[in-house]
Amino acid sequence: MASIRKRGKSYQITVSNGRDIHDKQILETATWTPDPNKTDKQNQKALERFAMDFEDRVKSGKYLDGEKMTFQGFAGRWMEEYAKMRLESTTTEIYRLLLDAHVIPVIGHLRLSRVQPQHLNRLYAGMLKQRKDGRPGGYSPTTVKRVHAIVSSIMSTAVQWDIITDSPCRRIKPPRQEKREVSFFTPEQASIFLAELDRGTMEGTIPLQHNIFFQLALSCGLRRGEAVALQWKDIDFADGTVTINKSMAIVEGKKYLKTPKNRTSERIISVPAHVLGMLGRYRLEYDAYRAQLGSQWAGSGHLFIQWDGSQMYPSTPDHAMRKIIARYNGAHEEKLPHVTPHGLRHTSATLLISQNVDIRTVPNRLGHAQTSTAMNIYTHALQKKDAQAAETLENLLMQKN
């Protein structure tokens, strides 16, 4: 029978749950607090019902660990027994970093079964409002949605393992990600940008490696993280191709090398002849610089590097591209739009579509998982082609009439 003991303003209910392998009695406990709006008699009946229900759940095996295990405790178990067995080591490390930075400090102390939608809403609202790295503003909805996905996986696993009965994540929605219009170059603007790269490299104001970075991003449609992660072993000069099989990500200020975002992101892409020629010249410059640096060299074969040969920081191309465009715009009346390295990938797809490249080839080259993804992203280019198709059909029909 359940034991009831008053402890301050609450009551502790204790039920025996058999004996362990050492013949030691297993005791399960629960806490009940009276309702101040009810009479003593009503609270007494409620306490007795709670004690009976608790004893029934313990005796029937329906008492779940989630009523005494904290979120932090289960998150550690989830990491070891679930995440590490199913996910890449870099992915689990990123998950651990996000949990430790954002989730554990806010809800880690809560009993797993006591985590409610309001706790998660408060967590996400706090992330959107203020960053922890001292930078102004809050985290993006994309980051918050990523954290929500991790919490949701943890809670869903707890349900599957019969530790809790329901996941609070089912009853909330993470912040909506606002679709940002990506700026990209027209064919004419792309030609101007490439010419500006070559001019700057000849004059010594744009490093050859920056020129090649942007040339590859535009001609091959690479993601920024894919380009930063490139190594010389990924370049096949004989076949004229580049192999994409890894990507660089920054999470909470730390660099992580990981496999691309989906299976189709791993691909082999043909490189234009003029870019291949630039890569050949850059290799000679690269090797000479490495020899010059001697013992100070800290590189491991990455194409795009810092002064000591170590891998280029992912934000470097963004800063460099802003400077190049600003310098050009300062000297010309016809301005270039403020396109980012990601915008070069967008430009690449748009140019391919405008040149009637098959719609199935475009996502394969850019590493999209589905053709529909490319169609959704590059709607503007497809709409222009559709308008051209309508005009062509109209001209054909008018001629027949």
Model-predicted segments: where are they?
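N-terminal DNA-binding module of tyrosine recombinases/phage integrases
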Residues: 8-10, 17-122, 284-303, 310, ...
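C-terminal catalytic core of Y-nucleophile DNA break-rejoin enzymes
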Residues: 28-38, 241-243, 259-281, 298-322
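Catalytic-site neighborhood detector that most strongly recognizes the C-terminal catalytic loop/helix
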Residues: 64, 184, 248-250, 366-392
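N-terminal DNA-binding recognition helix of tyrosine site-specific recombinases/integrases
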Residues: 98, 102, 110-122, 129-172, ...
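Short, basic (Lys/Arg/His-rich) helix/loop patches that form interaction surfaces
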Residues: 133, 137, 195-210, 220, ...
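Basic, Lys/Arg- and aromatic-enriched nucleic-acid-binding interface segment
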Residues: 137-141, 145-147, 160, 164-166, ...
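C-terminal secondary-structure termini that scaffold catalytic or DNA-interacting sites
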Residues: 195, 199-201, 239, 252-275, ...
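Short, polar N-cap/turn motifs at the start of nucleic acid-interacting alpha helices
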Residues: 234-241, 357-379
